[in-house]
Amino acid sequence: MRRTFVPLWLNSASKPHAGTFIVLFAIEAWSRATLITVVPLQALNLLGDAQAVSVVYFSVSIIGLISTMVIPIVVYRIKRRWAFSLGGLLMIAALWAYSAGDPVLFAIGLACQVVATAFLEIVMNLFVLDHVPRSEITKFEPRRLFFVAAPFTFGPWLGVWLAETISPQTTFILVGVFVAALMVFFWFLRLTENPAVTMPLKPPPNPVRFLPRFFIQPRLRLAWVLAAGRSSWWMMFFVYAPLYLSTSGYSPQVTGMIISLSLGSLFMAGVWGSIGRKYGMRFILVSGYALAGGLTIMIAVLQDWPVIAVSLVVASAFAASLVDGAGNIPFLRSVHPYERAEMTSVFVTYRHTAQLATPGIFSVVLGVFALPAVFVVGGTCFLGMAWLSRYLPKKL
């Protein structure tokens, strides 16, 4: 009986469901959130100015974009669980490079982190599509965002506090613990690919072939553009908001606290999700993009009043949380089950495209204008996303 009971208990405990993936996303969020403020401030310290930081982020994002297109082939060759583990190892390598305090190793570490994030995100999204029914996706996304709110609320402050009061290495060690916990929990789950939507015998997806297939579908194309706009805004926020606060005279710990307070807006994801299910996700997206865009532009307009500008930084993040409340629902509700792997690998390029375009554009902008100009560009981009969101289906 005992030999039978233990495997059955393990099978029940590790049976994947929506809550399982929320825990997985939450652990991964701690590993990213703790570095959110630390990494840009370290970049500014090592490189000297915001324009140099933009150039490094732009260069690294090229690597991230290329890796995103190659990852589906890697997943096919070594299977998802090993691809996920490879992402964890790359994250550990990034932490080692960050801890060295060298500009070249910092850039290498940033590249490792970008590629690691791509591996982890693609694999987790594929497992979600396999195991969470399409009818539950609109509930899953707001719940996921609610449970990753705690890491993103406390992580930015925690990372800076540890770096300032103990040592930067302490922050990197803690993130290493989060990554190790993520790997242990993932392997405990013993996740397998759903044979109903996975075809092991087909060749690895060809990026040249499935890129056109993705972008000829209007709903997928719109979902990608909206996600890229959202990611660009957060890329601007995570990198340039700490730089703006630091150059405005705020200490690293205060900067971390302001970013943490701003990201506490993610706790509202469940509320926005409920409103979206009642009035439609299109309403949430149009409202969120428009409100956040206007507030972001006002940061630059009122830059001579630091207290008001800081309040607008926090307010714009809360407005942007409306957009996060919808998450990737426009894509998840549009993709066909039989081409999930191929379309997901293309869709997640929105993150790396945003990471590539944002610092690339801002490196040019900062060559002509002062740092607050990035908020004008970012806010204008969000207003454009609000206009495009009008083309989403009303019943989304």
Please state what every model-predicted region is:
Residues 113-148:
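Cytoplasmic helix-loop-helix junction between adjacent transmembrane helices
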Residues 82-96, 176, 283-297, 379:
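Structural signature of the two symmetry-related core transmembrane helices
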Residues 282-327:
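C-terminal transmembrane helical hairpin of 12-TM major facilitator-type secondary transporters
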Residues 5, 9-62, 219-258:
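Helix-loop boundary and gating motifs at the non-cytosolic
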Residues 39, 119-132, 322-335:
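Intracellular juxtamembrane helix-capping segments at the cytosolic ends
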Residues 1-15, 191-229:
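Juxtamembrane intracellular "pre-TM" segments in multi-pass secondary transporters
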Residues 338-367:
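A late C-terminal transmembrane helix in Major Facilitator Superfamily
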Residues 67-79, 268-281, 366:
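Helix-to-loop junctions at the C-terminal end of transmembrane segments
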